[in-house]
Amino acid sequence: MWYPLIGGWFTELPHPGDGEEERCFVRIYTQLDTWKKFQVGKRVARNGAGMADYILKLFDRELIRFSAKDTGDIPEISITHIDQDSLSLIPLGMEVTDKGLARWLKHRKIPRNRAYIHSFLAKTGLSANSTMGIIDVSKGLSLNDSYWVVREGDSKTFDQCNLYDNKFSELLANIAFTGYGSSVRTSVVSSPEFTTNGMLPKCWRRQSGKIYLYKGGTVGASNTGNEPYSEYYAWQIAQILGVNAIEYNIAKWKSRLCSKCEIFTSKDVSFVPVGNIVKQGGMQAVIDYYGTLDSKYRDMLEDMFVFDAVIANTDRHFGNFGFLVDAATNTLKAPAPLFDHGNSLFNFASPIEIESKDVFINFADIQAPVCYSNFFSVAKSCMKSRHREGLRHLLNFKLKKHPRYNLSSKRLKYIEIAVQKRASLLLEGETHSESELSFW
């Protein structure tokens, strides 16, 4: 197993020249010969019939050569070569083993719980069970970063194929968002939809030279479909609190209400979710990791806990916050702006909960985070003076209505009251309230 650390990579290998079972940690550049011999033997043993040869690249730089056999959701992988001078450019959090690369490839495709996934893939002649089939068509290109995967012998360049600069299929965007549309020849497919995470209907659209994410809401019940409103109003609250968050608007596309936001990554700046780096230990492990970083990262994490407590964000998970990364050097650049606040501001309150203020407030009071136990104890334990100033501004705030699309005036009023109450609760007492999480 290889371990990414600041300043280099470590791997666990047999002690050189020692026939015993003893193992030790050594810097990778001291074990290149051992690693190459290990890989050659493995390649001879495992590179059997039915495997195709691929290259994982960053821009046009080769990182890893490997053979792959499409055996379903997780492909059979055999790494055949690792560029010794590019170890620091390996995707953050990816274990450079056959299984580690297979897992990375699995997550380089549209998730199984995505709305309309089967319709989307069927229209392109693909299957959710064929990871390498999807990779063959999409080249693993993403709007999160500048990694991609090509068949050995493919002469195309990153400039010719990347999704940031090149046109992508409007037809596939339509299918991804609505589930309807004509079949598409995979030989001409270029779309970010193959590598976009999340379960709600969504698609990327290029407008006036910029790229925007359109995301619909839940459907099927009287308390669904409010996510676009929550995104729009949560951003207003972030502005009052001084929190760095992505601006959302409300729009309609294909007759469906959706949120709309501009992309915050580029060819040069990638997004890496914290879950790619901190893989176990839960939120406490995340806090501990942030504690090893510059103060701007700790400030952002504190801002997130306070903001989530105010808006009752019940879907903050390890995939929707993290880091902006310099794509050229693969090093942390800044904390990523906060995004994905559709499951906040009591979006699942039903018509029954809207009948009276008291019923709505009771519903608001029982909301809980997904990765820790209590909004208020955690937020209070990391609050600073900058947060109190913003919270005081929320005590009498009013939501600004959208020019065209809005929740009912009654629901908006109740949201304002609930947010004001939550701000007041956070301002009460000292900041050392008991919390299940410990900070710096």
Which residues are covered by each model-predicted region?
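Canonical protein kinase catalytic loop motif
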Residues: 317, 322
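Phosphate/dinucleotide-binding and metal-coordinating scaffold of catalytic cores
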Residues: 2, 8-9, 24-31, 35-306, ...
